Swiss-Prot record:
Protein name listed in UniProt: NADH-quinone oxidoreductase subunit I
Cofactor(s) the record lists: [4Fe-4S] cluster
Reaction(s) catalysed by this chain's protein: a quinone + NADH + 5 H(+)(in) = a quinol + NAD(+) + 4 H(+)(out)
UniProt-annotated binding residues for [4Fe-4S] cluster 1: 62, 65, 68, 112
Species in which this protein is naturally found: Xanthobacter autotrophicus (strain ATCC BAA-1158 / Py2)
GO molecular function, one term: 4 iron, 4 sulfur cluster binding
Gene3D superfamilies: 3.30.70.3270
Length: 162
């Protein structure tokens, strides 16, 4: 028994086997991504930064029904509706989302009858102050304009499952 232990210690078999194990994993393809330069695929149902969408003619989609405000469990959405227009429709005068309160549940997107409020593909929207995470209507519309192509593609891919 002692001779066997001495032989293992002399030949450093454990060290050598550990070295070969490390070398085997060293030359295998990496399992991780180099994040800032490589990004993994996002699901069509990914819920990121909020955006307000427009119709192709440039008119905003939101009809001020306030369903998203009512269904929000975090009470992060505040909407004020303007007076009815001549054609009987309403538009919002104020649409604010407090992203600090938001839990990204997606209920607002599910409740919207005209797909006006959506959670887009952007997940890189860090801020230095809390005030930057208070989104007003202009910021939400700008997000919608910036991400419209990706948002439309995600909604089209998810449409059969709705």
């Amino acid at each position: 028994m002692k001779l066997d232990q001495a032989a293992r210690g002399l030949f450093l078999t454990e060290l050598v086997s550990g070295f070969f194990l490390a070398m085997r994993y060293f030359f295998k393809p990496k399992a991780t991504l180099n994040y800032p330069f490589e990004k993994g695929p996002l699901s069509p149902r990914f819920r990121g930064e909020h955006a307000l969408r427009r119709y192709p003619n440039g008119e905003e989609r939101c009809i001020a029904c306030k369903l998203c405000e009512a269904i929000c469990p975090a009470q992060a959405i505040t909407i004020e509706a303007g007076p009815r227009r001549n054609d009987g429709t309403r538009r919002t005068t104020r649409y604010d989302i407090d992203m600090v309160k938001c839990i990204y549940c997606g209920f607002c997107q599910e409740a919207c009858p005209v797909d006006a409020i959506v959670e887009g593909p952007n997940f890189e929207f860090a801020a230095e102050t809390r005030e930057e995470l208070y989104y007003d209507k202009e910021k939400l519309l700008a997000n919608g304009d910036r991400w419209e192509r990706e948002i439309a593609r995600s909604i089209a891919m998810d449409a059969p499952y709705r």
